[in-house]
Amino acid sequence: FDGAYKIWGIQLDKDTFYKQKLPKEAVVHKINKKAILPTPKLVYGTATLKGKILDYQKEMMQQMKMHIESPALNVHNEQNIIKIKEDGTFQAEVKVASVTSVALELPFGWIECLIAPNEETSLIINTKELCRRQAHLQKKDKTYGEPVYFNGYLASLQQELASVDIDIVLKSVYYMDMYNDIAGKSADEYKAYVLERLPSIRKEIAQSPYSNACKELLNIQVDLAATGKIAMTERELKSAYITVNKLNKEQTDDYFYNTRIDIPTGYYDILKEFTSINTLKALYGKYYASTIYLISFLPNSLDVLKETLGTGQGPLFDNIKFNKLYQSIKDFTPLTAEQNAELKTFSSPAYAEMLTQTNKEIIKKIELNKRKTGFTVNETGQVSNEDLFPSIISKFRGHTLLVDFWATWCGPCRTANKAITPMKEELKDKDIIYLYITGETSPKGSWENMI
């Protein structure tokens, strides 16, 4: 079954085992060390990702997940499922507004790459080399080539990025260790802690043999990561205190909502060092989507960004606004007349085109949902908290129930709803009632449109 531990490619002849015939497309591109990082284009179009998995056998996994790290598509952790053909080839098309970082999830590792509108990214995935690099006993053995070969969109840069061996993670510790370290610290102490490695990382990038384009992108990724850490100051300090001191729910709520973390004047001035986050080139960064999400936890985030970056305009502000509108649409709340007017304020029509198309698709889904049958909406009535669940299920006594607690805003919940559809089809002749329960945190309008 999928996910089971399996061994492929066993070969008793050592010489035969070490022979590796690569396809002619598996080339290592020459790197131009002086190349600069090109400014990505903003245009709403189709990005194509295709490739081939070497040594693939049809009994292996027949599909893989493609995680899309777009500031829009990342809102609900959206994934594309890519079918793999019997010869190991695959192809996917995604609508995007600019360069977008994606990751392919495979049993033998994650493959990161860049896609872009009206461009094609082609991969040759060398399973033998990917597995060798992860094997404790074979890490120092002779290589079987590169783990991934890139062709098409920015192939040489993508190849170089895949080979980077600089650790640019600002604080590479288990989260509980970090919480123990920062619990009770001041904001300034937290900042010094999370940015401790920043100077040494910058120095290592500067002294590395990589191209100017690659170095620029690595520094952008450091800027994005650092911005996310600073944006999370209050939340991380509170979470650390709550976790380390093992507060119960009542104590947690009281501390989280009533405790004020003292943020010194000028605390966020450090963001002036990370101005690359407000450039189009930041869209190359694999942390871009998560950074925009983390910025949402920063109190008065737009005011802070305007003050520290010296402007209230630019790609970062466009994408924050884009993210908010996109999330509203994906929550089954079509754009209002006021929001439609707001589309004209974007610096590029690409954002408006993507939002308009997504809005049309949601309206179509809502209309289809209105025609659905085979379900009943039940009200709970006036029942005490203790009797609520027994009261709900008492209406279905004698039946097998599958109960799903979900919320309109919960990405994993909605992913799970889709995931069990094949199972429901398989069990449609069984006496099973599917009971979906949500609460007041789900806006009623969104809930009605979704069901």
Where are these regions (language model features)?
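Oxidative protein folding and maturation machinery
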Residues: 127-399
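Thiol-based oxidoreductase modules, predominantly thioredoxin-like and allied folds used
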Residues: 429-446
